[in-house]
């Protein structure tokens, strides 16, 4: 059965180095984007996931993926990062830690 509500889950592994997956469930078809921020509020990357159909995106083959790099391709520093997940009718956020 399709998910009854859109849900964002904790990224894994957490802490991570250098890559991380962000699992979620979608209650309806939607374009998805994920912005990744430093604790100071600086956006380091936007993941434009694109249009996704209703479903569960939990394991590594389906969850959103971040390679731990900035928009310009540089590896981010160790520390805490926040992710903001957006669909047409849902916004969720989470915290993840990169340890090198």
Task: Describe each PLM feature range.
Residues 36-40, 70, 98-100:
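Residue-level signal for short segments within beta-strands and strand-turn junctions
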Residues 28-31, 43-76, 87-92:
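Glycine-centered tight-turn motifs at strand-turn-strand junctions
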Residues 12, 16, 24, 37, ...:
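Aromatic side chains
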Residues 23, 74-100:
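C-terminal tail/sorting-segment detector
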Residues 9, 21-23, 33, 63-65, ...:
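Beta-strand secondary-structure signal
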Residues 1-12, 16-40, 46-49:
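Glycine-centered coil/turn sites that cap beta-strands in beta-rich domains
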